Amino acid sequence: MKQKNVETLNTMLQGLEAFQMILDKVIQEEQEAFDNLSESYQNSEKGEERQERIDLLQEASDNITEAISNCYSAIE
């Protein structure tokens, strides 16, 4: 791989890692807030929707982890 492309990817990966750190903080805060809600709210339709949104954010974070790993493997 051209050195210029490796440098571009490294810069992009730094940005993705920073984004993921922020995303993971949001996920943690949202999950803690959800966990502190009453069990009846958690089991309600709104509670289930809220947990689903948290799960979607976690899935996005997991996908970012995989993308970062794949990119690092590609430039090794």
Spans of model-derived segments:
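Long, low-complexity or tandemly repetitive, helically biased scaffold regions used
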Residues: 1-76
